[in-house]
Regions:
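N-terminal leader segment of winged-helix/HTH proteins
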Residues: 1-29
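Short amphipathic alpha-helical boundary/capping segments
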Residues: 24-32, 129-133
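Pre-recognition alpha-helix immediately N-terminal to the DNA-recognition helix
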Residues: 37-42
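Short capping segments at the starts of secondary-structure elements
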Residues: 46-51
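A short acidic, leucine-rich amphipathic alpha-helix
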Residues: 54-60, 71
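Basic amphipathic alpha-helical segments that dock to polyanions
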Residues: 71-81
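Non-DNA-binding regulatory cores of transcription-related proteins
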Residues: 81-159
Length: 159
């Protein structure tokens, strides 16, 4: 296995995400394997959404040999550790993203493009809203429609 990316240094780093993962592994008496850290490091380099297949391809292209089952299992661990979130957008395979500030997903029903937007008004509404006998941890808002690119293509096709 390739080790020139200093995975051992990465695993011992003071990065808050790495620390959170280490704490999760310790709390659950799980092994801290190089493969798990390879997966975590690659995920931390990704901005936005990704599928497990895309993640596997990135790891492979980096020259690491990590089995598909290890990638899937590590993704599940990262979800349990509250580092990743899984999204299953209508009609699409599962996508993942690092947990960040609350945001809305705009999903194009024509091309499948997913765009994230931060809506401070909606966030303020959710933070101020009190639900009877319920404490909100996080929320996901998916808005389905047609992106501007697909709308232009449809308009041109009509003419």
């Amino acid at each position: 296995m390739r080790t020139d990316l200093h995975i051992d240094d990465f695993a011992a780093s003071n990065n808050p995400v790495v620390r959170k993962f280490n704490e999760y592994l310790d709390a659950h008496s799980m092994r801290k394997t190089t493969e798990r850290y390879v997966v975590l490091k690659r995920i931390m380099d990704i901005n936005g959404h990704f599928t497990v297949e895309e993640l596997q391809q990135m790891i492979d292209s980096d020259g690491f040999r990590v089995s598909r089952s290890t990638v899937y299992n590590t993704v599940e661990l990262l979800i349990e550790a509250k580092i990743l979130r899984r999204h299953v957008f209508e009609g699409m395979q599962a996508q993942y993203e690092r947990i960040t500030l609350p945001h809305t997903h705009l999903i194009c029903t024509s091309c499948g493009k997913v765009r994230e937007v931060r809506d401070n008004n909606f966030a303020a509404f959710m933070n101020a809203r009190r639900f009877n006998a319920f404490n909100t941890d996080h929320y996901s808002l998916y808005v389905y429609g047609t992106c501007s690119t697909c709308a232009r293509k449809k308009k041109r096709a009509k003419h």
